[in-house]
Each structure stands twice: as structure tokens, then as C-alpha cells.
Amino acid sequence: MVFESYGVEKYYDSFNESSTYLLRLMKYRLPETNEPNLGCDVHTDKSFITILHQNEVNGLEIKTQDGDWIGFDPTPSSFIVMAGDALLAWSNGRIHSAVHRVVMNGKKPRYSVGLFTYNEGIINIPEELADDQHPLQFKPFDHFGLLRFFVTAEGSTAECTVKAYCGVLNVC
Ligand SMILES: O=C(O)CCC(=O)C(=O)O
Ligand SMILES: [Fe+2]
């Protein structure tokens, strides 16, 4: 849908062939007395796309552009689809990766499952997504290189890891 909406579906098949997936199950136990209730610290995903599903215990919060944190109450059958940093770069800065965290406020443990998409090899920014109005903001990049960069001192402390890794201009 994303590729089609930008008219670049011709790149989809080869992109899809290089996609690889990580499925992760997560358990958030209840915080003990005097323990912070932060289940998962503030971050953006380094994936291309993340698909999340949770049990009935809420806790995921998304940061708005105004800096407010919003929680939500998905129906039990909902999946949450979030853009990751690789999609931010691929879309030439059009699709922002969601800044999010998990806060444990309930009385029950929280379980979630996440499917994270990554790509093998170099991700190229479609030339159709760059023009005079939208100058190229990211260089072609190695997605697994981005993951390796993220665990370095520079990558983990950068304001925007993907920008620090392969950015041309300051877009974050
Ligand atoms: O558990 C969740 O809902 C989100 C987990 C998450 O943000 C992550 O694993 O990157
Ligand atoms: Fe995340």
C-alpha cells in the first residue's frame, strides 16, 4: 500500500524479496514497589515496519509532534502498524517513525508480540521521492549496518540514529 500510494510499486517485488522478519514475544511484569513503571524506554524502531499485537493490557504510548504522550485502547483483535527508522529514510523523510514507549499502569502483566521487518542489503531511496521540492535527505543505506551503528556510542546517543547514519540534511 505504501509503495503504491507513492507510485513506486515497481520497486516492491525486489524490496519484498530482500525482506526478513523478527518475531518477538514480550512480557511486561508489574513494577514492584518503588520501581519505575516504564516497561520499555522511549525509542523509535530501527525496523522498516513494525506490527504489534497485545493482550488486553494497555501501555503503549506514542509521542505526538507537540510532545504529548497518547495512549490508546485497541480492540482485542487490533494490530498496530508503526513506521520504523528505515521507512523514514526510504520515504525520504515523508513517513516519520513513531516515538513510543510502554508504561505499566495496570494491575495485570502485559504481553505483546511484535513483527519487525528488516531488509538485507542496501535500501535505496526511490528517485521518484526526491525532487527540487523534496531534496534527497538520506543516502542509500545498509539496514543491518544501521542496526550495528545503533549499538555504538555514537549511534545510541544520536538524536536521530538513522539521520546520523545515512542522513544528508537534518530532517528529524
Ligand atoms: O510492547 C509493545 O507494545 C511495544 C514494544 C516495542 O516498542 C518494541 O519492542 O520495540
Ligand atoms: Fe518499539
Specify the residue positions occupied by each region the protein language model found.
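C-terminal flanking tails of non-heme Fe-dependent oxygenases
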Residues: 1-172
